[in-house]
Amino acid sequence: MEPAVSLAVCALLFLLWVRVKGLEFVLIHQRWVFVCLFLLPLSLIFDIYYYVRAWVVFKLSSAPRLHEQRVRDIQKQVREWKEQGSKTFMCTGRPGWLTVSLRVGKYKKTHKNIMINLMDILEVDTKKQIVRVEPLVSMGQVTALLNSIGWTLPVLPELDDLTVGGLIMGTGIESSSHKYGLFQHICTAYELILADGSFVRCTPSENSDLFYAVPWSCGTLGFLVAAEIRIIPAKKYVKLRFEPVRGLEAICEKFTRESQRLENHFVEGLLYSLDEAVIMTGVMTDDVEPSKLNSIGSYYKPWFFKHVENYLKTNREGLEYIPLRHYYHRHTRSIFWELQDIIPFGNNPIFRYLFGWMVPPKISLLKLTQGETLRKLYEQHHVVQDMLVPMKCMSQALHTFQNDIHVYPIWLCPFILPSQPGLVHPKGDEAELYVDIGAYGEPRVKHFEARSCMRQLEKFVRSVHGFQMLYADCYMNREEFWEMFDGSLYHKLRKQLGCQDAFPEVYDKICKAARH
């Protein structure tokens, strides 16, 4: 009884403090209090609910039957929109705060919202090595199911809450992408509802133009209702090597060399300054040396990026065996390194042991509760960007990141970009090795001004035939955007499929003016 009374007294005192200081003051200056007391427990409840729901639905095998009914319901909504005169564009009815992007699309308030309640794994076919899923299936769901039966996705992007739909309509990448490409490159079929309410299935050999145009289109060619994705046999552990490297030239040379070695299942780099990095290479294995086993995903363990930094500080190489699912979600608990700005003591051993089992808070709930003042502060004093540049331009790109934003750590993830039709492809006719440079945090450059600094960075990326991930703030104008992306197939299909009066152009959904 006494703990309950103490908790009630603490809650009452907190509410009185909020009343005196004001909710906005607390959310901005002591946000960790609000996050720890409210968002962490709420996030845990969300996770438990969705995990239990997904398990029950899959065990009852009810998803395929429900799927057909839900698809018919989406078609009905689209046809009703047409019958009512097609007065506004359509978009999915999923609230903007539920997405992993830091911004919320303004268009949700003005467009016709089509409700798409598709969040289940439909089928796992181990003979064909295919998993068929609905668009709102998360990476957490996928790993929980596939890893338990000895399978995995060739490319399994990091954060638990990333969805299949977002990774196809936007993009997705992981440390295995040097072998398999982006998330779109492991997909074998898409099922969509088009602007006229019709259903279409597209593959590399059937409706191939649409198949190659869908990735990066952000839902502006149709509504994704299912996808078929390759699966491969999984092993229990990742044998991960850590190697600190100093000097930018040595870093780029080592990273490129390891990315070209296809015997590496995983390649990743964390850059802690312009000339200090730890490069990690891994292979899947069923064998383990017990003394080197590290269950890094356990709630009481140090955050992964801090653990990696120790190899740099002590200037030693290392070898560890990490459980496969722990490896896949190694950056989830700390949201890469963003959580250190929200809960500054989050990596403290005492906090980890007492409350680490509730971490991380849902990104969606962080967005929902941030408020207008905090949103503006984040916009001007916080950067979240992923720029994809050719590997040969890596050194030049890192100098540009240093000069324009100066954010560390920086995430380095290699990927092979095939020469295929669509919005994103290499400049030449052959596949090319690229690197994703991810910068997340507070810029340290003097007199940082978000718009001018980001436009300068975007200009550099265009000049080397690179690409910007579309979840991030985009300051390019329309002409610059279509200089970066190849819109030839995309515009052809928008006209051919009647999308011009049904969906906004992709630029109008992702540009800075379209989000808040």
Swiss-Prot record:
Q: Which GO terms describe its cellular component?
A: endoplasmic reticulum; endoplasmic reticulum membrane; Golgi membrane; nucleus
Q: Which sequence ranges are marked TM in the entry?
A: 32-52
Supply the alphabetized keyword list: Cholesterol biosynthesis, Cholesterol metabolism, Endoplasmic reticulum, FAD, Flavoprotein, Golgi apparatus, Lipid biosynthesis, Lipid metabolism, Membrane, NADP, Oxidoreductase, Signal, Steroid biosynthesis, Steroid metabolism, Sterol biosynthesis, Sterol metabolism, Transmembrane, Transmembrane helix
Membrane-topology annotation of the record: Single-pass membrane protein
All copies of the FAD-binding PCMH-type domain together span: 58-234
The record's principal subcellular location, in a coarse class, is endoplasmic reticulum
GO MF entries:
Delta24(24-1) sterol reductase activity; Delta24-sterol reductase activity; enzyme binding; FAD binding; oxidoreductase activity, acting on the CH-CH group of donors, NAD or NADP as acceptor; peptide antigen binding
Q: What is its EC number?
A: 1.3.1.72
Record flagged with keyword Glycosyltransferase: no
Matching InterPro entries: Diminuto-like, FAD-bd_PCMH, FAD-bd_PCMH-like_sf, FAD-bd_PCMH_sub2, Oxid_FAD_bind_N
What residue ranges lie in the Lumenal compartment? 23-31
Residue positions annotated to bind FAD are T163, V164, G165, G166, L167, I168, M169, G170, T171, G172, I173, E174, S175
UniProt protein name: Delta(24)-sterol reductase
